[in-house]
Amino acid sequence: MYDLTIEVNQKCNLVCRYCYLEDKNNKEISFQIGKKAIDFAVVYLRKQRDNMLRINFVGGEPLISFRQIKDLVAYVRKINENIRTKFTITTNGLLLDEEILRFLIQNEFSVKVSLDGNKKINDRNRIDRNGQGTYDILMKRLNLFSEFQMQTGRCIQVNHVVTHNNVEYFNLIL
């Protein structure tokens, strides 16, 4: 299996206290660069006589670049090349809506959502651009995450960032 991670952007709708993105350039990958990366992976797989490609979409917040992700997935489907492809995405989940949900289900994505704990713990670090916590917004998306799990049989994975100000609560997540 070839594991290809595509950073579709360096943009985010949050300003998490521990994040490095403040120092980034707020750019988005072009379709052509994503296509070149996929083409490279396909060539590599052929040389290795392998036929499994996993593409991980990350950011910033990758769902900000949903159109790019859709275009790159469509490209992979178009070239096919007798390659089995799996897709994953790591997201803060705040931009998830019905359209994105349908796309993730139709393309058999695995989904990882960032959540640092209960409301108090999560909202210490994961804040929006207005300085507000994001826990409540994410919880409003629970019905979409539940629908994803029911339709795919795949669990939503949780990405938990342990920092100096939440490490004592880590056992509450487990």
Identify the meaning behind each predicted range.
Residues N26-I29, E61, N130:
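Pocket-edge positions in alpha/beta enzyme catalytic cores
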